[in-house]
């Protein structure tokens, strides 16, 4: 038996609407990236790689961007 969020939270509850919106966004993500054609294990591999790459990019930006911004400010003599 499949239980939808409307059965648990009611069709008009804010949690049910939020769940429906997140489900819709995930569905759009699957359609835009064409992941709906992949098998579940392939989708998991793709999503894992995507999360890893985005995580590394965010971490690198967090670590190195302040140094680069400070170097630019020193170069243009905005900060002494």
Curated annotation (Swiss-Prot):
Species the sequence originates in: Xenopus laevis
Source domain of life: Eukaryota
Compartments it resides in: Endoplasmic reticulum membrane
Stated name of the protein: Serine palmitoyltransferase small subunit A-B
Lumenal side: 39-43
Any single GO CC term annotated in Swiss-Prot or TrEMBL for this entry: endoplasmic reticulum membrane
Gene expressing this chain: sptssa-b
GO molecular function, one term: serine C-palmitoyltransferase activity
Major subcellular site: endoplasmic reticulum
Biological process according to GO: ceramide biosynthetic process
Keyword RNA-binding: no
Segments in the Cytoplasmic topological domain: 1-21, 67-80
Keywords of this entry: Endoplasmic reticulum, Lipid metabolism, Membrane, Sphingolipid metabolism, Transmembrane, Transmembrane helix
Any single Pfam family the record assigns to this protein: SPT_ssu-like
Keyword Manganese annotated: no
Family: Belongs to the SPTSS family. SPTSSA subfamily.
Record field: transmembrane: 22-38, 44-66
Description of how the protein assembles with itself and partners: Component of the serine palmitoyltransferase (SPT) complex, which is composed of SPTLC1, SPTLC2 or SPTLC3 and SPTSSA or SPTSSB. The heterodimer consisting of SPTLC1 and SPTLC2/SPTLC3 forms the catalytic core of the enzyme, while SPTSSA or SPTSSB subunits determine substrate specificity. SPT also interacts with ORMDL proteins, especially ORMDL3, which negatively regulate SPT activity in the presence of ceramides.
Family annotation (InterPro entries): Ser_palmitoyltrfase_ssu-like, SPT_small_subunit
Membrane topology: Multi-pass membrane protein
Lineage: Eukaryota, Metazoa, Chordata, Craniata, Vertebrata
Annotated site location: Within the serine palmitoyltransferase (SPT) complex, defines the length of the acyl chain-binding pocket, determining the acyl-CoA substrate preference: 37
Its biological purpose: Component of the serine palmitoyltransferase multisubunit enzyme (SPT) that catalyzes the initial and rate-limiting step in sphingolipid biosynthesis by condensing L-serine and activated acyl-CoA (most commonly palmitoyl-CoA) to form long-chain bases. The SPT complex is composed of SPTLC1, SPTLC2 or SPTLC3 and SPTSSA or SPTSSB. Within this complex, the heterodimer consisting of SPTLC1 and SPTLC2/SPTLC3 forms the catalytic core. Within the SPT complex, SPTSSA stimulates the catalytic activity and plays a role in substrate specificity, which depends upon the overall complex composition.
């Amino acid at each position: 038996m499949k239980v939808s969020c409307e059965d648990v939270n009611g069709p008009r509850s804010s949690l049910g609407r939020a769940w429906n919106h997140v489900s819709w966004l995930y569905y759009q993500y699957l359609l835009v990236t064409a992941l709906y054609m992949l098998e579940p294990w392939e989708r998991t591999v793709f999503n894992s790689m995507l999360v890893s790459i985005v995580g590394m990019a965010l971490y690198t930006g967090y670590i190195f961007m302040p140094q680069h911004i400070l170097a630019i400010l020193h170069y243009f003599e905005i900060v002494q």
